[in-house]
């Protein structure tokens, strides 16, 4: 049985509350090593229990497989849709996919999805003609009430904020930084250089 860390539970709770109360896309900012795949799995499981579908978008096939494995760990069956992995399945309630594989095969995604989770959401372009915006437009045309949740360890895009009035994402519903992870004992604090006691010439 997978037991989430306290901050993972907090992130899940905050994201679920936002999804249930607002149509505005929001972000979970979770630093590297926070275990975002667990948060994703918990959210997708909750949506499945409501007999609805989740599309989880990740940058590459390896991450699709890793996130799908985490979903299996909590006793659920994922689908994977990634050309690089040779898998194009949408039969289960949670589909882990790469954006271009979806965009190139939109006819396979005609069913209504309740939630899109976009990992590494800082990569989503604000250009309305971009592939990412075309993808979001497709799913919004099927379900005008679809919820969109972004996950990122980097809440900026090319030195600009991800969250603003004119951007895709309107808020950050939860945040945990690398400093907070270290102070809570989940990670080792970053250090630069090598101590004199371990370095000699």
PLM-predicted stretches and their roles:
Residues 52-53, 91-94, 113-115, 144-149:
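Loop/turn-to-beta-strand initiation segments
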Residues 21-44:
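Walker A/P-loop
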Residues 1-29:
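Conserved pre-motif I regulatory segment
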Residues 123-190:
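Post-DEXD/H (motif II) to motif III coupling segment of the RecA-like Helicase ATP-binding lobe
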Residues 94-120, 124-135:
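Conserved RecA-like ASCE ATPase "motif II neighborhood" in helicase/translocase motors
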Residues 15, 39-47, 135, 139:
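Hydrophobic residues on the short alpha-helix immediately C-terminal to a glycine-rich phosphate/catalytic loop
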Residues 71-107:
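Inter-Walker segment of RecA-like/P-loop motor cores
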Residues 37-42, 46-73:
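Conserved Walker A/P-loop ATP-binding site and its immediately adjacent core
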């Amino acid at each position: 049985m997978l037991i989430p860390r306290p901050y993972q539970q907090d992130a899940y709770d905050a994201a679920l509350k936002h999804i249930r109360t607002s149509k505005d896309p929001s972000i979970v900012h979770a630093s590297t090593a926070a275990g975002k795949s667990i948060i994703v799995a918990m959210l997708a499981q909750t949506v499945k229990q409501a007999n609805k579908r989740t599309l989880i978008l990740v940058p590459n096939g390896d991450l699709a497989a890793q996130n799908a494995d985490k979903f299996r760990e909590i006793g659920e069956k994922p689908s994977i849709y990634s050309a690089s992995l040779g898998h194009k399945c949408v039969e289960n309630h949670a589909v882990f996919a790469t954006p271009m594989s979806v965009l190139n095969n939109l006819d396979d995604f005609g069913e209504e999805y309740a939630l899109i989770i976009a990992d590494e959401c800082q990569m989503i372009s604000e250009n309305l003609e971009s592939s990412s915006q075309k993808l979001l437009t497709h799913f919004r045309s099927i379900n005008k009430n679809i919820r969109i949740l972004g996950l990122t360890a980097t809440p900026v895009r090319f030195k600009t904020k991800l969250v603003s009035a004119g951007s895709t994402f309107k808020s950050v519903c939860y945040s945990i930084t690398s400093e907070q992870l270290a102070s809570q004992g989940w990670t080792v604090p970053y250090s630069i250089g090598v101590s004199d006691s371990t370095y000699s010439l």
